[in-house]
Amino acid sequence: MLSKLDQNGHISTIPRLDRDHPMFYWIFKNMDFTQWSSAKCSRVLWLSGPLECNIPQVSSYIVSQEKNAALNTEHLVLYFFCSAATKTRSVAANFTHTLLNQIVCSSPMDKRILIIRRFLYSLIEGISNKETSLSREERVLNEKGLPDISIQSIILNAPPKELFTALEAVLGDEEQRCLSVIIDGLDKVSYQQSEFIREVRAFVEYLQQRTSKIKILLTSRPLAEIKDLFDGLPCIEHDRERKGPSVS
């Protein structure tokens, strides 16, 4: 029922990165990236560069590093490559459903159905409050705790705001877990890009209120409309970055 995307399959198509290659010095030898990578407190970073910078390779590498560091811990690693969703109009649904699936898969078996129910209850409540035309029967879950067929299409086509709110409700129950979030290629979103990125910005601001440690990495090309929406976020932009002492 959920429109999740195979992120690991997509990552497997991205060429592996040579961290020591000079073309990536602007990131890996940058003081802002070093602070983000090694931070003991919450950090947000936006990487911005043209296509030839091969930023998806960097994102793929960081996802792998974060997942390896999270082994045998409660640390939660969530990631989404927008380029995997270029053929669909429902990127907000793809995004929230994919991250929900990652949360479920990283949780104990006895908690998984509770997480899914939490997401669905929050989503249905949000839609019900917005769509007053829904009948009482349409708002009721069946005996298995899953939506009736009559509301499944509503869930799959829910507005972005309600989808993000439902995802936040799930993460609110995971408050004590440290969290890494990597969202790559926001410029690749072709349908309702501004609306989606605006929701991502609000999502980032929500996560920054968490008491546990968070690391958030966002990437895109340096497009003017994205710059406007991400104004104020810490950023490394290609050829405009601050350089550490190890970079000439």
Name the predicted role of every residue range.
Residues 1-248:
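Conserved NB-ARC/NACHT P-loop NTPase core of NLR-like innate immune receptors
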